[in-house]
Amino acid sequence: MSLASNVLLQASRLGEMVIKRGGATGLMVHRDTKENNLNVKFKFTSENQERIKAIMDIYPEGHKAGALIPLLDLAQRQHGWLPISAMHEVAKILEVPRMRAYEVATFYTMFNRQPVGKYFLQVCATTPCMLRGAETITETIEKKLGIHAGETTKDGLFTLAEVECLGACVNAPMIQINDDYFEDLTPKDVNEILDDLKAGRKPAAGPRSGRLAAEPFGELTSLKETPPGPGFGLQAALK
């Protein structure tokens, strides 16, 4: 195998690994595909153009580049994922170099630079969730949908990915589906959630255990006293 062929093979394998354990962000560089190239045009809808105006009105004169993340997010919500033509359109609107859009889109893993299903299932696979059964949750989804991490169902309804910490460790194991967190999961919960989504129903987000947010099971174990008011702990000279 030539050096060039070996490099291409390694890049391909790296891309597969990144997709499996990083969602649909892909490599940090763009590769033209049938659905993602400069010939595939992107324009914001008239409704979203009104939203863009409202977003940009938040930022002071000379600082509209600060709207880069909100506009990329809006483009992704309109298109379902973030193609390179959408990045170019955002850069054009904000009058910034295209590289600025690339930098943001490749840095934040919430931007999906490859197509994903209608429901993007992101299973947290880091230590707290793993210790609480994340592998079983992933296996349940794979068995239910007939796909593995990094794959999309044939009907385009679901994409599955294993991701890094989503910040809900106390509610492990958990998954993120689009914008919603589903926490304190069991395999039964996962099957019910997937059945609801398949049927067009919206399952209730949050803990499935019956607790509110991240409150402890049973009674409080800390913070039992009324917290002191402002100025507590200050040196006398500072009061």
UniProtKB/Swiss-Prot annotation:
Keyword presence, Cell membrane: no
Cofactor: [2Fe-2S] cluster
Cellular component per GO, a single term: mitochondrial inner membrane
Catalysed reactions, as listed in the record: a ubiquinone + NADH + 5 H(+)(in) = a ubiquinol + NAD(+) + 4 H(+)(out)
Annotated stretches, region: Disordered: 200-239
Keywords of the record: 2Fe-2S, Electron transport, Iron, Iron-sulfur, Membrane, Metal-binding, Mitochondrion, Mitochondrion inner membrane, NAD, Oxidoreductase, Respiratory chain, Transit peptide, Translocase, Transport, Ubiquinone
GO molecular function: 2 iron, 2 sulfur cluster binding; metal ion binding; NADH dehydrogenase (ubiquinone) activity
Keyword Iron-sulfur: yes
Pfam family, one: 2Fe-2S_thioredx
One Gene Ontology term from the biological process aspect of the record: mitochondrial electron transport, NADH to ubiquinone
N-terminal signal peptide: none
Binding site residues for [2Fe-2S] cluster: C124, C129, C165, C169
Cofactor binding note of this UniProt entry: Binds 1 [2Fe-2S] cluster.
EC number in record: 7.1.1.2
UniProt subcellular location: Mitochondrion inner membrane
Protein family per UniProt: Belongs to the complex I 24 kDa subunit family.
NCBIfam families: nuoE_fam, PRK07539.1-2, PRK07539.1-5
Entries under PANTHER family matching the protein: NADH DEHYDROGENASE [UBIQUINONE] FLAVOPROTEIN 2, MITOCHONDRIAL (PTHR10371:SF3), NADH DEHYDROGENASE UBIQUINONE FLAVOPROTEIN 2, MITOCHONDRIAL (PTHR10371)
Function of the protein: Core subunit of the mitochondrial membrane respiratory chain NADH dehydrogenase (Complex I) that is believed to belong to the minimal assembly required for catalysis. Complex I functions in the transfer of electrons from NADH to the respiratory chain. The immediate electron acceptor for the enzyme is believed to be ubiquinone.
Subunit structure: Complex I is composed of 45 different subunits. This is a component of the flavoprotein-sulfur (FP) fragment of the enzyme.
Protein name: Probable NADH dehydrogenase [ubiquinone] flavoprotein 2, mitochondrial
Organism name: Caenorhabditis elegans
Name of the encoding gene: nduv-2
